[in-house]
A protein has these predicted regions:
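Glycine-rich phosphate/pyrophosphate-binding beta-alpha loops
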Residues: 131, 156-161, 203-204
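A short core secondary-structure module
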Residues: 148, 152-198
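A structural signal for short hydrophobic beta-strand segments in well-ordered beta-sheet cores
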Residues: 140-143
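C-terminal helix-coil-helix/basic helical segment that borders enzyme active sites and/or dimer interfaces
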Residues: 28-36, 267-280, 291-312
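A short, Trp-centered hydrophobic/proline-enriched beta-strand micro-motif
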Residues: 118-126, 169
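Glycine-rich beta->alpha junctions and the first turn(s) of the following alpha-helix
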Residues: 5-7, 195-295
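Internal helix-loop-helix
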Residues: 43, 50-119, 159-166, 290, ...
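Intrinsic disorder at enzyme termini
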Residues: 1-13
């Protein structure tokens, strides 16, 4: 297998590098570094990506996308991370793929253009006081009366709920089913009566996360994503593809950024090399490992382009 980028892919990388040099300002980087998560300047930058069609790089053309292979999204995300700013976009990475998979025609028509432009901010509402890494143990309930649903419960550690227009909410719709089978997904307008967002302030004054209280918030049946009680499978499918593309690219880009800073530090401080003669070997070892990870990611992306799931 040839692990090199094709001429077209390499040209796209160069285009991304040029764009980031012009549009990814120091102010955006500092905001992200301070918050550790997207802020207002970051979301303005995402809208610029949307204007170039780069939020829909891999979307099918029928949904207004460019229909590019997954490697193009990987390239963009990696280049951002190499500059100290991770690509974090719940709308594009979780919401849009799920809507394409199981959304109604009306949901696709309404929400996909908002995702493509970057105009709407979406928050993930998964974690709860008693359901963190064990998502299937969530307790927030969505009771149905035939015409719609009433949502009640609490969500924790949502990173963008304070800025979000909409939320992607995992809720329990069947209390008697096995815990993985009684979950449904809803799209919730954050202005819905009964929704309250409060910052979770750490001992260090960090305000990056929020808790969300949902008290008898009413949504119509059109807010249900796909089939009732199938939410767990929709979440799992979306996360598989996200880990294989943006997740891997962010990790590799971040590590490349840190290694490059380490190299610059050593160059600027010769005494460090004298005091730690094995440092050169350690740094080169990390750089080699990163290249191996990049090649493994390219292999997975190649499988995805061939129609295989990333867990193949």
């Amino acid at each position: 297998m040839d692990f090199r980028l094709s001429p077209e892919e390499e040209a796209f990388r160069e285009e991304v590098v040029g764009f980031l040099a012009q549009e990814l300002s120091e102010a955006v980087r500092l905001e992200y570094e301070e918050r550790g998560l997207p802020g207002p300047l970051y979301h303005a930058f995402l809208r610029k990506l949307g204007q170039r069609g780069w939020l829909t790089l891999t979307w099918p053309e029928e949904y207004g996308g460019l229909g590019r292979p997954p490697i193009y999204r990987f390239i963009m995300v990696e280049e951002m991370a190499k500059r100290g700013v991770e690509y974090r976009n719940v709308a594009e990475s979780i919401v849009a793929p799920s809507l394409m998979l199981c959304g109604s025609p009306q949901q696709k028509e309404h929400y996909l253009p908002l995702v493509a432009s970057g105009e709407a901010v979406f928050a993930l509402l998964y974690s709860e006081p008693h359901a963190g890494s064990d998502l299937a143990s969530l307790e927030l309930q969505a009771g149905s009366d035939g015409a719609g649903y009433t949502l009640s419960g609490q969500k924790l550690f949502s990173s963008e709920a304070d800025m979000a227009h909409y939320a992607w909410v995992a809720s329990r719709t069947d209390l008697n089913a096995p815990k993985h089978r009684g979950i449904s997904i809803f799209l919730l307008d954050m202005k819905t009566p009964g929704v309250t967002v409060r910052p979770l302030i750490s001992m260090a004054g960090d305000r990056r996360f929020n808790e969300v209280f949902i008290d008898n918030a009413r949504v119509g049946r059109e807010s249900l994503i796909g089939e009732e009680n199938r939410g767990w499978y929709y979440v799992a499918a979306a996360l598989d593809f996200e880990r294989a593309t943006a997740g891997a690219a962010m990790f590799i880009g971040n590590a490349t950024y840190l290694v490059s800073r380490m190299i610059d530090y050593v160059k600027d401080n010769p005494a460090v090399q004298i005091g730690c003669p094995e440092l050169r070997s350690k740094i080169s070892g990390r750089a080699t490992e990163l290249e191996v990870l990049r090649m493994l990611s390219y292999q997975v992306l190649s499988l995805m382009s061939g129609g295989h799931a990333p867990t193949y």
